[in-house]
Curated annotation (Swiss-Prot):
<feature type="binding site">
    <location>
        <position position="26"/>
    </location>
    <ligand>
        <name>Mg(2+)</name>
    </ligand>
</feature>
<dbReference type="InterPro" id="IPR027417">
    <property type="entry name" value="P-loop_NTPase"/>
</dbReference>
<dbReference type="InterPro" id="IPR004160">
    <property type="entry name" value="Transl_elong_EFTu/EF1A_C"/>
</dbReference>
<feature type="region of interest" description="G1">
    <location>
        <begin position="19"/>
        <end position="26"/>
    </location>
</feature>
<feature type="region of interest" description="G4">
    <location>
        <begin position="136"/>
        <end position="139"/>
    </location>
</feature>
<dbReference type="InterPro" id="IPR031157">
    <property type="entry name" value="G_TR_CS"/>
</dbReference>
<dbReference type="InterPro" id="IPR009000">
    <property type="entry name" value="Transl_B-barrel_sf"/>
</dbReference>
<keyword id="KW-0460">Magnesium</keyword>
<feature type="binding site">
    <location>
        <begin position="81"/>
        <end position="85"/>
    </location>
    <ligand>
        <name>GTP</name>
    </ligand>
</feature>
<dbReference type="GO" id="GO:0003924">
    <property type="term" value="F:GTPase activity"/>
</dbReference>
<protein>
    <recommendedName>
        <fullName>Elongation factor Tu</fullName>
        <ecNumber>3.6.5.3</ecNumber>
    </recommendedName>
</protein>
<dbReference type="GO" id="GO:0097216">
    <property type="term" value="F:guanosine tetraphosphate binding"/>
</dbReference>
<feature type="binding site">
    <location>
        <begin position="136"/>
        <end position="139"/>
    </location>
    <ligand>
        <name>GTP</name>
    </ligand>
</feature>
<keyword id="KW-0648">Protein biosynthesis</keyword>
<dbReference type="InterPro" id="IPR004541">
    <property type="entry name" value="Transl_elong_EFTu/EF1A_bac/org"/>
</dbReference>
<feature type="region of interest" description="G5">
    <location>
        <begin position="174"/>
        <end position="176"/>
    </location>
</feature>
<comment type="subunit">
    <text>Monomer.</text>
</comment>
Length: 394
């Protein structure tokens, strides 16, 4: 009997494995693809295929990431797995792989380890909304009480970083035994994916979110007025909609009088479209690159925020020397560079290339931002770091 053809109609959800080195993230990834391929169609991926992750570039930073996909009975999952700890840090901070939820893999034989904690903290800082837990290597632990203890420790760790430890699904299994086909452990993989289906909500579609367009260019067309161009980041825009221009200068209100794409007039534009938008009553000098056009009231300009930052190593083309407090690079948000000053956490004197660190940044001009917005850190046009807005201060 032929496998059913791949149905695009299933909701699409992005997930990834996180957790300490050698706790079995990649083995679990292989196990899920194998079990789901057998149950729901699709293709299994072997450990070695996943482990030899190809290099990709995100915001000028090289990251090794493996992408696999699989089907549950009611969803299509895209799943990322990284070979090294540094790749996780970079991946989560650059948002190269946006996760709707994460699978925290923790070895039942070892319990939570430093990277277990660090990945939970990173998930909190970069806005991964949901975590499900897979306690791996349970076949190596005979003592029921020890398993319960490890489960309790993981739940407490989640609580410490404001994830709901008590409500988080925790599945106990063995990825290796599942790959080897031992039925009780195959069932645990099915249980894990069912928990993901239940506990991780399908993300809101980009078109359902409030409209925002980062402005790339501004033209004035004689007899018609001012046109701003850019790619719609999220939402939908209709001719006649009221919008605000936010960032850098005081916020201005205007009305959309035309939307065009490839020189054709449209009634509306939506997330992903590269468009020109004709705005009423604004002059060319009233608007500049780096501002955003957005649904009124949906996003505010801010200058001071806390960020989680990854600083490129020398090998990645970053700085060769550390930086200290008072460091003033440019912060590249969406389409423009804004100078800002850096405050380091208490007790931190300097930051070395290759570090990841939490810092407070004060920009000289306000930028339209929400928590979760990504940015690059640049010095004279060269990328030296990547960051994500973790918390807005003012």
């Amino acid at each position: 009997m032929a496998k059913e053809k791949f149905e695009r109609s299933k909701p699409h959800v992005n997930v990834g494995t996180i957790g300490h080195v050698d706790h079995g993230k990649t083995t679990l990834t292989a196990a899920i693809t194998k079990v789901m391929a057998e149950k729901n169609g699709g293709s299994a991926r072997k450990f070695d295929e996943i482990d030899n992750a190809p290099e990709e570039k995100a915001r000028g930073i090289t990251i090794n990431t493996s992408h696999v996909e699989y089907e549950s009975p009611n969803r299509h999952y895209a799943h990322v797995d990284c070979p090294g700890h540094a790749d996780y840090v970079k991946n989560m901070i650059t948002g190269a792989a946006q996760m709707d939820g994460a699978i925290l893999v923790c070895s039942a034989a070892d319990g939570p380890m430093p990277q277990t904690r660090e990945h939970i903290l990173l998930s909190r800082q970069v806005g991964v909304p949901y975590i499900v837990v897979f306690l791996n290597k349970c076949d190596m632990v005979d003592d029921e009480e020890l398993l319960e203890l490890v489960e309790m420790e993981v739940r407490e760790l989640l609580d410490q970083y404001d994830f709901p430890g008590d409500d988080t699904p925790v599945i106990m299994g063995s990825a290796l035994k599942a790959i080897e086909g031992e039925e009780q452990y195959v069932e645990k993989i099915v249980e894990l994916v069912a928990a993901m289906d239940d506990y991780i909500p399908a993300p809101e579609r980009d078109t359902a979110k409030p409209f925002i367009l980062p402005i790339e260019d501004v033209f004035s067309i004689s007899g018609r007025g001012t046109v701003v161009t850019g790619r719609i980041e999220r939402g939908v825009i209709n001719v006649g909609d009221e919008v605000e221009v936010v960032g850098i200068r005081p916020t201005q209100k205007t009305t959309v009088t035309g939307v065009e794409m490839f020189r054709k007039l449209l009634d509306k534009g939506e997330a992903g479209d590269n468009v020109g938008i004709l705005v009423r009553g604004l002059k060319r000098d009233d608007v500049e690159r780096g501002q955003v056009l957005c649904k009124p009231g949906s996003i505010k300009p801010h200058t001071k925020f806390e960020a989680e930052v990854y600083v490129l190593s020398k090998e990645e083309g970053g700085r060769h020397t550390p930086f200290f407090k008072g460091y003033r690079p440019q912060f590249y948000f969406r389409t423009t560079d804004i100078t800002g000053a850096v405050e380091l956490p208490e007790g931190v004197e300097m930051v070395m290339p290759g570090d990841n660190i939490k810092m407070t940044i004060t920009l000289i001009n306000p930028i339209a931002m929400d928590e979760g917005l990504r940015f690059a850190i640049r010095e004279g046009g060269r990328t030296v770091g990547a960051g994500v807005v973790a918390k807005i201060i003012e």
